[in-house]
Swiss-Prot record:
GO terms for molecular function: phospholipid-hydroperoxide glutathione peroxidase activity. Protects cells and enzymes from oxidative damage, by catalyzing the reduction of hydrogen peroxide, lipid peroxides and organic hydroperoxide, by glutathione. The lineage of its organism: Eukaryota, Viridiplantae, Streptophyta, Embryophyta, Tracheophyta. This is Probable phospholipid hydroperoxide glutathione peroxidase. Coiled coil: none annotated.
């Protein structure tokens, strides 16, 4: 949900989302951080490649200003059927994910989470704004502006050079 102002959100920092435990998280806490925002799923063919690479990127760059924000989504092939507790256990136990995992959201349609409406309007995809599948990635700069959007099949490791540019270690 956007902040209480009637203005259009100007950055990702203008949103409040729910974490996996149902608590409000004001995304302004990430001001000054580079964000990689990903819609994740536990039972997708891309899961076994994406989660380990996301974890590696996070371990490598979290102290340099990177945060990875994972939003579970069940809109693609019902590949995220579990509840938030099951999703967190899966990601944190199987893949040792230490990055924040948020409440399950819709990324498309009339019930799409406002933060995803903003991401899509900032960086449309090759075939329009809609998210096509799990593990679509958005790279956001330290000011909360969407810099790039990556297809589900783009590996997190291949985004490393873009992350390094934004955090200033290229």
């Amino acid at each position: 949900m956007a902040s209480q102002s009637t203005d259009q959100p100007k950055s990702i920092h203008d949103f409040i989302v729910k974490d996996a435990r149902g608590n409000d998280v004001d995304l302004s806490i990430y001001k000054g951080k580079v964000l990689l925002i990903v819609n994740v799923a536990s039972q997708c063919g891309l899961t076994n490649s994406n989660y380990p690479e996301l974890t590696k990127l996070y371990e490598q760059y979290k102290d340099k200003g990177l945060e990875i924000l994972a939003f579970p989504c069940n809109q693609f092939g019902n590949q995220e059927p579990g509840d938030n507790e099951q999703i967190m256990e899966f990601a944190c136990t199987r893949f040792k994910a230490e990055f924040p995992i948020f409440d399950k959201v819709d990324v498309n349609g009339s019930n799409a989470a406002p933060v995803y409406k903003y991401l899509k309007s900032s960086k449309g995809g090759l075939f329009g704004d809609g998210i096509k599948w799990n593990f679509t990635k958005f790279l956001v700069d330290r000011d909360g502006k969407v810099v790039d959007r990556y297809a589900p099949t783009t590996s997190p490791a291949s985004i490393e050079k873009d992350i390094k540019k934004l955090i200033g270690t290229s």
